[in-house]
């Protein structure tokens, strides 16, 4: 059975701690832009935590929402790419082939979620920050666009492990860095083609909504709205 990867985010559980942001940056070799580049809008964060406020002081409530690539089934970033660097895989992922990318930034402009990032410079890590670089993830060069991949390196490793052991993948066996690091278990990842998987069950929840669903992008990230 072909997999179709998706994610569910329980907004009741998210505390806004940004452990997911830190884990994603470490796992995927995301460069640190620094204060000057960040001030110019050149920071890179494959996942961000948005904050919303309700009420008036002192009775103010803060709500958090993690936002990553929504891995849309009708992704507007894909048809605008002239080199097919941004494309759809058989497993429903919006993949980015870095050595095809010529940096037009059409995809970043087409993305309604603002989750694609252009590299304005070559990555530089001052010692000893280069030591924990992940050898399973390529370091992107100046002039290319990058984004969340659902930690495709972990997906591939999990499939290879299951194949070597002559078995099927287990639900919850593959965890992107953001999912693994969340102390509140607010993020769930899995196969949407498996109706019994936890992510499939959550995606069918009456609390489930999609981000900017009215745009017709068919995102595969489901947000479970707050009850409290």
Residue ranges and their predicted role:
Residues 1-228:
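Non-ligating segments of multi-cofactor redox enzymes
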């Amino acid at each position: 059975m072909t997999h179709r990867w998706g994610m569910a985010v329980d907004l009741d559980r998210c505390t806004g701690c940004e452990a997911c942001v830190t884990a994603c940056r470490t796992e995927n070799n995301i460069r640190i832009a620094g204060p000057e580049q960040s001030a110019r809008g050149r920071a890179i964060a494959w996942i961000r935590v948005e904050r919303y406020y309700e009420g008036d002081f002192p009775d103010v409530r803060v709500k958090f929402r993690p936002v990553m690539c929504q891995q849309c089934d009708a992704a507007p970033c894909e048809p605008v790419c002239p080199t097919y660097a941004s494309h759809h895989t058989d497993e429903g992922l919006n993949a980015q082939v870095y050595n095809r990318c010529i940096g037009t930034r059409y995809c970043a402009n087409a993305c309604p979620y603002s989750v694609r990032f252009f590299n304005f410079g070559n990555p530089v890590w001052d010692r000893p920050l280069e030591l924990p670089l992940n050898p399973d993830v390529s370091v992107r060069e100046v002039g290319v666009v990058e984004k969340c991949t659902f930690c495709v390196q972990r997906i591939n490793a999990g499939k290879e492990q299951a194949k070597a052991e002559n078995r099927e993948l287990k639900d919850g066996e593959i965890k992107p860095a953001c999912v693994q690091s969340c102390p509140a278990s607010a993020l769930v990842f899995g196969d949407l083609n498996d109706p019994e998987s936890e992510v499939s069950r959550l995606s069918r929840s009456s609390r489930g909504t999609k981000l900017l669903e009215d745009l017709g992008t068919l995102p595969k990230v489901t947000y479970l709205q707050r009850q409290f």
